[in-house]
Amino acid sequence: IHGLSTAYHLALELQRKGEGDGSDILIIDKTSIAAGASGIACGVVRNNYYQPAMRELMAHSVKVWESDSKAYSYHPVGYMQISPEVMREDVSTIAEQQKDIGYESVFIEGARESHSYMRGLFDDWQAQGITSVLHEKPGGYSNNTQAMYGLADKAEGEGVRILTGATVQEFKRGNGSDAITAVVTDR
């Protein structure tokens, strides 16, 4: 996902600045699109992180997923963290920080309150031992492989070339510097 996303956004930025376009960009993949971790990831799109900097980055990321849900095979169903007492304080901190950055979520505390909230959503709710619910209204899930092909289509739509089934064998450096001037593959 990182390579495809970088190529896509770089192509947009080059065009915006009038310094080129996607045809200046080549992605080399030794196997195929979605063959690595992105193709087997669980596909959850959420903003449930303990690090404040990560939370702001993920809030931005969720907006990107929402920007083209069809291409990214994204389903905006929200995200819930349903927790026992041992996690309540940490989850409360996440909820406070989400509120501070304007990320829409609901935080429910207390065993009775949590059970009631969940019963309001699922009338057959039966789980015991929960004392907090963090319900993120944005977020959801994506069909991972379809999302990667959707992102590849967006990148190619901007002129980015994608070469699959190629192994990088060598980097050529220019003029005695560390600057890479060429990439040698087995194709």
Describe the residue ranges of each PLM region.
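Glycine-rich FAD pyrophosphate-binding loop
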Residues: 11-38
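A short, glycine/Asx- and small/polar-enriched loop/turn
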Residues: 90, 116-128, 172-184
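Helical element adjacent to the flavin cofactor pocket in flavoenzyme catalytic cores
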Residues: 134-187
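Hydrophobic/small residue at the entry helix of a nucleotide-binding pocket
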Residues: 1-2
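Active-site substrate-recognition segment that forms the wall
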Residues: 9-12, 43-46, 67-78, 170-180, ...
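Dinucleotide-binding Rossmann-like beta1-alpha1 core, especially the glycine-rich loop
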Residues: 42-121, 130
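Short loop/edge segments at beta-strand edges and connector loops
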Residues: 29, 109-110, 164-166
